[in-house]
Amino acid sequence: MKTLGEFIVEKQLDFSHATGELTALLSAIKLGAKIIHRDINKAGLVDILGASGVSNIQGEDQMKLDLFANEKLKAALKARGEVAGIASEEEDDIVIFDGGRAENAKYVVLMDPLDGSSNIDVNVSVGTIFSIYRRITPFGTPITEEDFLQPGTKQVAAGYVVYGSSTMLVYTTGYGVHAFTYDPSLGVFCLSHEKVRYPATGCMYSINEGNYIKFPLGVKKYIKYCQEQDEATKRPYTSRYIGSLVADFHRNLLKGGIYIYPSTASHPQGKLRLLYECNPMAFLAEQAGGKATDGVNRILDIVPEKLHQRAPFFVGTKSMVEDAEGFIAKFPDEEAK
């Protein structure tokens, strides 16, 4: 049995220039995940369920657990001194870590502390998403938004933690995707899936079909394609949608499938955040042999203009994403007007 800590150190030894800072940073995320795991499991017994009564910069109600997870992860990252600052879905602006080693720290972290938190009240899987970049600004100076507004191709590492029937941490540093399952009796994450790859073909599609009337024509056509009978392509595909990006992505990664959150009439730019959700998941998907686009463009190539920028998102088994892109190209939005 190999633990997450042992695995990370082992991989670090493969690079003679490695300084151990990224290892320490990932260890901080691991600690934050353990704390969130512990408190999610007793969420119904203490007063951390439901809405907090405040809204984020996007005008969305923040759940108590959103804020709790944000504070715990922020504290864990700040304590290690390997991070110059963070950007979070739950923060209006970047958070600069002052003092200690922070000003000379090499990395910045972007995160969605608790994805799918609206599901927690009914005991449905939720998750944490993180993305790590090297800072652009000079060491010894305060970081700026410039350090965070980098395309996804610049990511050093990315991953997520899914809190479900078991808690699992999945990450990549650009050398494959690896998954670790938490053993609460030992307090450690143990390697359970090494070099995870998407199956060559998929048979699941994940999309909120309740918004069908608002979808672009190409997406509507693709959904109908998924539902049609065709033995050669093993259709109809199975529809599976949890409403938690981490949970839907994780299932499709292991089983084969596509996750879609397109632009809609009410959210023409898409709803998912490019920096906190799309980029890290796209990095993981590509490292696992999958594909991630906004329906036309590769997600990782998009140069962000603002912290809370949104994007349409198509991610999963490569052939399924390419099929969806084909329908979008064949039936452009103009035909739906």
From Swiss-Prot:
> Which Gene3D superfamilies would you find in this protein's record?
3.40.190.80, Fructose-1,6-Bisphosphatase, subunit A, domain 1
Q: What's in the keyword line of the UniProt record?
A: Carbohydrate metabolism, Cytoplasm, Hydrolase, Magnesium, Metal-binding
GO terms (molecular function) for this protein are: fructose 1,6-bisphosphate 1-phosphatase activity; magnesium ion binding
Quick one: which pathway?
Answer: Carbohydrate biosynthesis; gluconeogenesis
Q: Does the keyword Transferase apply?
A: no
Q: Where does Mg(2+) 1 bind?
A: E89, D112, L114
* Quaternary structure note: Homotetramer.
Q: What is this protein called?
A: Fructose-1,6-bisphosphatase class 1
Cofactor(s) needed, names only, are: Mg(2+)
Residues at which Mg(2+) 2 binds: D112, D115, E277
Similarity remark? Belongs to the FBPase class 1 family.
Biological processes per GO annotation = fructose 1,6-bisphosphate metabolic process; fructose 6-phosphate metabolic process; fructose metabolic process; gluconeogenesis; sucrose biosynthetic process
Localisation per UniProt entry: Cytoplasm
Give the reactions, separated by semicolons, that this protein catalyses: beta-D-fructose 1,6-bisphosphate + H2O = beta-D-fructose 6-phosphate + phosphate
Q: How is the cofactor bound?
A: Binds 2 magnesium ions per subunit.
Q: Which is a Gene Ontology cellular component entry for this protein?
A: cytosol
